[in-house]
Regions:
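ATP-lid-like helix-loop hinge signature
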Residues: 37-38, 59-81
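Conserved polar catalytic motif of the HATPase_c/GHKL fold
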Residues: 48-60
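Glycine-rich/acidic phosphate-handling loop/turn and adjacent ATP-lid/helix
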Residues: 84-118
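Glycine-rich nucleotide-binding loop
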Residues: 96, 140-147
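Glycine-rich ATP-binding loops of the HATPase_c
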Residues: 131-142
């Protein structure tokens, strides 16, 4: 993977190898994840977003495969810019089941140790908010989509 950001490249390669060990036929597409030279979002923060998003997507694909061995598993990660806003989108297959608590804005982890797990989306949201951005997600059928928006503006990286 070559995105223009070393941290993103390392994470993508690491997570890809982790995923194919347990889901050999998973398709991971990051061709449209690109970072320009005038990126004002710190690499560490990009790593927090991509690392947590990929962990969640890989776990969702694992769960889908465990329930339906013939299911197609995929993760697509892309980025784009609109004005001064930078977006990262992660789309992945999942089993179609979303568990939420009434007051929770994010799906609830299904892992038994929910104190150590279930923080990924909250970490992504916190990171996006550092750049005056936010997080949105949708689930349609068996496709989960996470969208992260951040302001990519000179000086933002110094506020964080």
């Amino acid at each position: 993977f070559r995105t223009g950001n070393t941290v993103a490249d390392v994470l993508l390669n690491m997570k890809y190898h982790e995923a194919v060990r347990t889901i050999p036929d998973i398709e991971i597409d990051a061709e449209r994840l690109l970072f320009s030279e005038n990126m004002h979002i710190q690499s560490y923060d990009i790593g927090v977003i991509i690392g947590n998003a990929l962990d969640n997507a890989i776990e969702a694909c694992r769960k889908l495969k465990a329930e339906q061995q013939e299911a197609e598993t995929f993760i697509r990660i892309s980025s784009f810019t609109r004005g001064k806003m930078f977006f990262i989108e992660v789309e992945n297959s999942f089993n179609g089941k979303v568990r939420r608590k009434k007051q929770s804005e994010f799906p609830v982890t299904e892992k038994s140790d929910n104190r150590a797990h279930g923080m990924g989306l909250a970490n992504i949201k916190h990171t996006a908010e550092k750049y005056h951005g936010g997080v949105d997600w949708t689930a349609e059928g068996k496709v989960f989509m996470l969208s992260v928006m951040m302001k990519n503006e000179r000086g933002m990286e110094n506020e964080c």
